[in-house]
Design a protein with these regions (language model features):
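Start-transfer (signal-anchor) and selected internal transmembrane alpha helices
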Residues: 1-24, 398
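Transmembrane catalytic cores of multi-pass membrane glycosyltransferases
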Residues: 28-97, 154, 204-351
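Membrane-interface micro-motifs in multi-pass membrane enzymes
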Residues: 39, 129-175, 205, 330-365
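Transmembrane-helix motifs of polytopic, lipid-linked glycan transferases
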Residues: 97, 101-126, 169
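Membrane-interface transmembrane helices that cradle and orient dolichyl/undecaprenyl
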Residues: 167-189
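Membrane-interface alpha helices of multi-pass inner-membrane proteins
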Residues: 189-212
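Signature aromatic-anchored transmembrane alpha helix within multi-pass, membrane-resident enzymes
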Residues: 242, 321-322, 370-400
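Conserved small/polar residues in nucleotide/adenosyl-binding loops
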Residues: 401-405
Length: 405
């Protein structure tokens, strides 16, 4: 029986969903043993007292205010806000939702970004979101360098893994506001949400906040040159994110923490930190680009090919795209290299890994788009689609027979 294109994609979806379920099942099974530790207690104490006193929603906001007001150490205000919402403050048994929240946020935020990027103008590409997004998520979760800090410890994971996810949602809203024609009311709602996320992301860990700032500024410059209407719609989002970062950097509490932990001195000058972040990020990429990553990219290329064929983007200057995305990615390491000379470990190493997979996929997708838009390749479109169709048939059949029953 000959399979139609729709049936092939259904089989691929089923196979990948089963694979994701198999990967996540043991990670979620041990969640019942998860328990608060370290900073969970200190940041969650006001919320715990409010819940014990039965203060309700008003108590939640008052506890967040107290956490901010009593702080004498942490300049990154978003860390204080998110840390105050520690699940065990509402009941110890709630702490087990931490890995569900963190892993779920990574997966769902990437689905949203993929939907915006590949299916925003080509609705038929919605069938490609899961076949591209699930393998990415499996690789990110399965090979996360520090899963205990990134998925199971609330205070660490919410300010790194979860904020990584918030940055992707922010980017999704940003692109939706900039590139899509929507009603005025919807655009206002999306802009307000994007502004709130910009403040939260900008006021959190410097790896995510600085790289997001660099990315938004690059997009803002591009819009100023090519799409002034998009620039007018989005400049406020970029401004708020940048101001949040600068507020954290220039806060007296940052100097207090620097004095307390490092004697008031830094390991490198700003220029040296930028140079070292480029150098070490390049070495990091080389060390991470192994057989499993290359295999993932090879498996995804047919789906990339099908996606970009239906997209209206021109995919110009792929070399410049790669250079800029490398610079944005490298900016994640600049803050820690500046302060203590390291790339950062633990939960920060995890978000470096998440972004590595994301940017690798984005670059291969972009280069595929550039190739398909070239005239020399465009005349062979029917042959390319036929090859892609044959690959999808074999791929779906293989996954169907190798997936767990």
């Amino acid at each position: 029986m000959k399979l139609t294109e729709r049936k092939k994609m259904i089989l691929i979806h089923i196979a990948w969903i089963l694979a994701l379920a198999v990967i996540l099942w043991p990670l979620f099974t041990i969640a019942k043993y998860d328990y608060p530790s370290a900073d969970d207690w200190s940041f969650g104490k006001y919320m715990y007292r409010a819940m014990q006193a039965g203060e309700g929603i008003a108590g939640v906001f008052h506890a967040i205010y107290q956490t901010l007001a009593q702080n004498v150490w942490e300049a990154r205000f978003s860390i204080l806000i998110l840390s105050a919402l520690q699940p065990a403050a509402f009941g110890e048994h709630f702490y087990r939702i931490t890995p569900y929240l963190m892993i779920g946020s990574v997966i769902l935020s990437q689905f949203l970004l993929l939907r915006e990027c590949i299916a925003g103008q080509a609705k038929e590409n919605r069938w490609l979101i899961l076949p591209i997004g699930i393998p990415m998520a499996i690789l990110q979760v399965l090979y996360c360098p520090y899963p205990e800090e990134s998925f199971y410890w609330y205070n660490g994971s919410v300010n790194y893994t979860f904020v990584y996810s918030l940055s992707l949602v922010l980017l999704t809203l940003y692109l939706e506001i900039a590139l899509r024609e929507t009603g005025k009311a919807k655009r206002v709602v999306l802009t307000v949400l994007a502004c709130l996320l910009a403040i939260l992301v900008g006021g959190n860990n410097f790896s995510t906040s600085v790289s997001t700032m660099c990315l938004l500024i690059c997009l803002q410059i591009l819009f100023l040159i090519c799409r002034k209407d998009a620039f007018r719609r989005t400049w406020i989002v970029t401004l708020l994110e940048t101001l949040s970062v600068l507020m954290c950097v220039t806060s007296p509490l940052t100097a207090t923490r620097l004095n307390g932990n490092f004697g008031g001195s830094t390991a490198n000058s700003p220029l040296m930190a930028i140079w070292l972040s480029l150098e070490r990020t390049f070495l990091n990429i080389i060390s991470w680009t192994n057989l499993k990553v290359l295999l993932l990219l090879v498996l995804l290329i047919p789906f990339f090919w099908k996606a970009v064929r239906k997209m209206s983007y021109e995919f110009r200057f792929p070399g410049l795209f790669t250079a800029l995305t490398f610079g944005v990615y490298a900016s994640q390491a600049t803050a820690t290299i500046y302060v203590d000379g390291t790339m950062g470990g633990g939960r920060q190493g995890a978000i470096l890994w998440y972004f590595y997979v994301l940017w690798m996929v984005a670059n291969v997708l972009y280069w595929c788009g550039w190739i398909t838009k070239r005239d020399a390749i465009a005349v062979k479109a029917e042959k390319a689609d036929l090859l892609a169709g044959k690959y999808l048939l074999r791929y779906s059949t293989c996954l169907l027979y190798t997936s767990p029953s």
